Amino acid sequence: MLVVALIYLLLAAVGAIGDGFKVATGDNARELFAFATNPLVGLMIGLVATALIQSSSTVSSIIVGMVAGGLPVSIAIPLIMGANIGTSLTSTIVSLGHVRNGAEFRRAFSAATVHDAFNILAVLILLPLEIVFHPLQIGAEALAGLFVGDASVDMKSANFMKILLAPASDLLSASTSWLPGTLWPGIALIVIGIALILFVVSAIGKVLRKVMVGRAQRIMHASVGRGPISGMASGTAVTVLVQSSSTTTSLIVPLAGTGLFTLKQIYPFTLGTNIGTCITALLAATAITGPTAELAMQIAMVHLLFNVLGILVIYGIPFLRRLPPLMAETLAELAQKNKLYVVAYMGGLFFVLPLVMIGISQI
């Protein structure tokens, strides 16, 4: 029961950070989409918008709606790719809960950033191919026609995790409502969320060392650590259930930090979360009817095809397969030696670089 309570607190803390960004930025994150005029800027906007909103599922759903409203698919595709990178900020924040223990922090940080490394590599390979040959756009267009119909699914009723976390979310939001304006309550929520994560991850680490032994450890290793296919399937299944890859990766990072799973075992699991998160965009697309329904389904299919092709190409080729863990381990070693690398990495990749690129495009 203690583990369940701590996991609930962890998810509430992650949610508080997302809510804080939403409150602090208002509609500014959504307004960023208006600057998407070319593929590179679209990629940067998808990245920073997801980092601000703290939900690739939400961003994907917004993009689906914008495509239905007339946004060219060729611009929407880089937005989706950027959202894939931006969503990994959450698990990187969670890894900070191990910052006081050097070895644990190295393991947790590498487990969090292997997701970033894979998504960045996938973009570096597939975005140029998409700009020149349009394989995702063409393939998704062919699939969209097969899936567009009269049936639709209500995403809100399907997201039971949001319902479960609503009491904690409301309580945390109420605790900052006395602050003036929207900026300060938002900042306060972010600070509360990070503080909760630092406390909960430390507590989870201590508890897991005691409970994850014997049968419990064998069950976890059978579902996550038995092999790549099992790991990917588990990551996909859990993410489909909770409709949030951020939530799934946030749960697995403490397990890596405490040494219960190796980076080699975590890596395929995080790839599965990429597939699972596509369900939200697909559900959003089914809710759109009329002449734009097929376009909306097309961009949702792009999200799925991008993640599937990324896994087939990168994980399927041994040389490429080794690159994300190598990049993550190198970054984690640097971060363990000097925490300024953590600040530079998180601030630079998720905010400074994309905002500078967006600013330059407007000159």
Predicted regions and their residues:
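Membrane-interfacial helix-loop connectors
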Residues: T50-N84, V99, A144-D154, A158, ...
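Long, highly hydrophobic alpha-helical transmembrane signal-anchor segments
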Residues: I53, S57-S61, M161-G186, T273, ...
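Membrane-helix interfacial "entry" motifs
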Residues: D27, E31-F35, L71-P72, A76, ...
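Juxtamembrane and boundary regions of transmembrane helices in multi-pass small-molecule transporters
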Residues: Y8-A12, I93-K162, A195-S202, L283-I363
